[in-house]
Amino acid sequence: MKIHEYQGKEILRKFGVAVPRGKPAFSVDEAVKVAEELGGPVWVVKAQIHAGGRGKGGGVKVAKSIEQVREYANQILGMQLVTHQTGPEGQKVNRLMIEEGADIKQELYVSLVVDRISQKIVLMGSSEGGMDIEEVAEKHPELIHKVIVEPSTGLLDAQADDLAAKIGVPAASIPQARAILQGLYKAFWETDASLAEINPLNVSGDGKVTALDAKFNFDSNALFRHPEIVAYRDLDEEDPAEIEASKFDLAYISLDGNIGCLVNGAGLAMATMDTIKLFGGEPANFLDVGGGATTEKVTEAFKLMLKNPDLKAILVNIFGGIMRCDVIAEGVIAGSKAVNLNVPLVVRMKGTNEDLGKKMLADSGLPIISADSMEEAAQKVVAAAAGK
């Protein structure tokens, strides 16, 4: 789960991290009111969307008068903000953050992530703040410094000081940087975050260290114990299809292709999408019905996929272990009839009650294309999507 910058800064404040004064605004008049409350002479008007690259896309403006705050708020609020992370369709801006201006001398980068290779929490830092860290990692990997943090000890003073020095924090400001890094770690750890990022971490002309931006991602599996984080959820920033899928316990992610995929198990789902691409097709979605699929869940899965106007064909790929093939067959038949399926449907089933499931499909009278292997299924669905 993602949250907005202003929400991330609320979390940072709770853990003692220095951030500029600022508040969210949901209208132009509210933006002006917040600016007046903060006082001048400089304010930053920031679009709040769940994507990076807002500045380059025109979603961050520096205002030097209340009139400019109104002008920029009017420009940004309601705009379709396009960044390298939103795709060409962009994301509508429904809220702003109005913040006091900052004296920027150095822009640094710090973040905490879970490194899946070492299976450790890693603190990363770079002197190249204010930029895409992916770009820095690609062009100048030597400028990224890493520290492994052991949960049993937390981020030690020496570790924080060493990283701060390596990324260019002046010696006199290192105690401030240490407090910010340790606060960031505590926020990451105690909220079950999967990412906690400050970009940029600013060092001002007088040596003051502050977090000018805040980005958090949270482990959705841990949200049950963090109602205060769930309260930050903004459904306007999420894919409506993914929200609908979550109501039925379906793991669904929209993609850009035209071949719908209905699979049980995340690993098999990814392998299915890879095989479709291998034979020249493009998946329209990731959809894992899980091990406890019911007729209702399969029907809802069909409904979700058919809401995609680009959909040309559907591949159902099931391995019947916990999930019985006859139950899936029942769901496929009911789902196809319920939605008046009008695109080619390829079904491949293996495992528990496989023969029964195949017989049910064959006797259904529906124009289902059968396949025995994943490769055969992928080839058939790619051909069907192409109208062959």
Curated annotation (Swiss-Prot):
Protein residues bound to ATP: K46, G53, R54, G55, E99, A102, E107
Catalytic activity of the protein: succinate + ATP + CoA = succinyl-CoA + ADP + phosphate; GTP + succinate + CoA = succinyl-CoA + GDP + phosphate
UniProt organism field: Burkholderia cenocepacia (strain HI2424)
SS bond partners: none
Gene3D superfamilies membership: ATP-grasp fold, A domain, ATP-grasp fold, B domain, Succinyl-CoA synthetase domains
Domain ATP-grasp per the UniProt entry, residue ranges: 9-244
Annotated InterPro entries: ATP-grasp, ATP-grasp_succ-CoA_synth-type, ATP_grasp_subdomain_1, Succ-CoA_synthase_bsu_CS, SUCC_ACL_C, Succ_CoA_ligase-like_bsu, Succinyl-CoA_synth-like
Any GO molecular function: succinate-CoA ligase (ADP-forming) activity
Family stated for the protein in its record: Belongs to the succinate/malate CoA ligase beta subunit family.
GO biological process: succinyl-CoA metabolic process; tricarboxylic acid cycle
Residues reported in the UniProt entry to bind substrate: N264, G321, I322, M323
Cofactor (UniProt): Mg(2+)
SUPFAM superfamilies reported for this sequence: Glutathione synthetase ATP-binding domain-like (SSF56059), Succinyl-CoA synthetase domains (SSF52210)
Binding site for Mg(2+): N199, D213
Record lineage: Bacteria, Pseudomonadati, Pseudomonadota, Betaproteobacteria, Burkholderiales
Role played: Succinyl-CoA synthetase functions in the citric acid cycle (TCA), coupling the hydrolysis of succinyl-CoA to the synthesis of either ATP or GTP and thus represents the only step of substrate-level phosphorylation in the TCA. The beta subunit provides nucleotide specificity of the enzyme and binds the substrate succinate, while the binding sites for coenzyme A and phosphate are found in the alpha subunit.
Pathway named in the protein's UniProt entry: Carbohydrate metabolism; tricarboxylic acid cycle; succinate from succinyl-CoA (ligase route): step 1/1
Pfam families: ATP-grasp_2, Ligase_CoA
Protein name: Succinate--CoA ligase [ADP-forming] subunit beta
Record keywords, A-Z: ATP-binding, Ligase, Magnesium, Metal-binding, Nucleotide-binding, Tricarboxylic acid cycle
EC nos: 6.2.1.5
Co-factor note (free text): Binds 1 Mg(2+) ion per subunit.
Cellular compartments per GO CC: cytosol; succinate-CoA ligase complex
Quaternary state and interactors: Heterotetramer of two alpha and two beta subunits.
